[in-house]
Amino acid sequence: MANGTNASAPYYSYEYYLDYLDLIPVDEKKLKAHKHSIVIAFWVSLAAFVVLLFLILLYMSWSGSPQMRNSPKHHQTCPWSHGLNLHLCIQKCLPCHREPLATSQAQASSVEPGSRTGPDQPLRQESSSTLPLGVFQTHPTLLWELTLNGGPLVRSKPSEPPPGDRTSQLQS
């Protein structure tokens, strides 16, 4: 062999590997720190670092301060977070679409009981006069029930599909 190595012996043979290690004999009785305390300190510091990263990520995922969240301005959201912020968007838009309580009571007293001015007028009067303003913050399921049952946020329910929709024709 030209280079003096044995081709049958792998490179990671025991003798070859020990040539590159500097094994220093350590007497554990002479150590100032206990041998397990170093390992415990390592894992505790690693866990603290992971918790710190989690808290930083959690802080960064919040959409601004509470003052920013309660402001009447419209906030731009990322396109991938629309599904996640749907509940918050509905709560933000709810005060915009609701009438003041005094206005709805005044309209309810001025409108005759048998007359209807629109398909959603009685629903709007009932929901705005019987539910207080902060009820949706404490009971968010009421918002979904009102929306699904044709509450004040639903202006009109189409009885037939839009002109370009062919899904009803395909089912027939």
Swiss-Prot record:
MF terms (GO), sorted A to Z: corticotropin hormone receptor binding; signaling receptor regulator activity; type 1 melanocortin receptor binding; type 3 melanocortin receptor binding; type 4 melanocortin receptor binding; type 5 melanocortin receptor binding
Cystine connections: none
BP-aspect Gene Ontology terms: protein localization to plasma membrane; regulation of adenylate cyclase-activating G protein-coupled receptor signaling pathway
Subunit relationships: Homodimer and heterodimer. Forms antiparallel homodimers and heterodimers with MRAP2. Interacts with MC1R, MC2R, MC3R, MC4R and MC5R.
Record field: transmembrane: 38-58
Chief location: membrane
Subcellular location: Cell membrane; Endoplasmic reticulum membrane
Family to which the UniProt record says this protein belongs: Belongs to the MRAP family.
Lineage of source species: Eukaryota, Metazoa, Chordata, Craniata, Vertebrata
Protein name: Melanocortin-2 receptor accessory protein
Organism expressing this protein natively: Pan troglodytes
Top-level taxon in the UniProt lineage: Eukaryota
GO CC entries: endoplasmic reticulum; endoplasmic reticulum membrane; plasma membrane
Membrane topology: Single-pass membrane protein
Keyword field: Cell membrane, Endoplasmic reticulum, Membrane, Transmembrane, Transmembrane helix
This protein's encoding gene: MRAP
